[in-house]
Amino acid sequence: VEEGPLKTSSDFKMQEADAYPELYQEGIGRMSKDGAITILQGRAVGGTTLINWTSSFRTPEPTLQHWAQVYGVKGHSAEDMAPWFEKMEQRLHVAPWALPPNANNDVIRLGCEKLGYHWKVIPRNVLGCWNLGYCGMGCPVNAKQSMLVTTIPATLDKGGELLYLARANRLLLDGDKVTGLECLGMDERCVAPNGRR
């Protein structure tokens, strides 16, 4: 279920003026509650994986520990999560960036080396990347291993269904069992509900 539209690689024109209103929640204007942080959240089939910049890090161990201590999250230690991280890294082809750093990033690399700081190349979820530099506007060559080109097609191949332009409002429950999902249809531009349920 996705609130936004279904877009494919042929729709990604590498134009910010088109991509931001079409692919981002609130046209890239979504903010944290206090307005201090812009939240880059996708609004199309594939969600935020469609518009992220492909950096693929494992959740840091201190973060996992914080979740356990503050929120009581169990079964998510670094050791517990390691096989799941490995599985997703394989599925999404996560590997260090294959090309040397560009000129501006090479300055950072040289600075790190002169200051004695450790650095390494960012791990990315790509396969056959052309390094066009427009990851945040949808990948026009399907190299980014977003849910649009990985998990969703795999689910559809196994008989799953895809519902888009549908805002999920609430789960329908019978006791502790989910029996359905109440959705509200969205208009073609995904700006407002169209009244369909």
Residue ranges and their predicted role:
Residues 7, 128, 190:
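Flexible, glycine-rich phosphate/dinucleotide-binding loops
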Residues 70, 74-171, 175-178:
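Conserved redox-cofactor binding core of oxidoreductases
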Residues 5-6, 57, 167-169, 186-188:
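Short, glycine-/Ser/Thr-/acidic-enriched flexible segments
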Residues 170-197:
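Conserved beta-strand-loop-beta-strand element in the redox core of flavoprotein oxidoreductases
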Residues 41-43, 110-111, 153-154, 196-197:
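A general structural signal for short secondary-structure junctions and capping/turn motifs
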Residues 41, 52-54, 121-123, 164, ...:
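Pocket-edge structural micro-motifs
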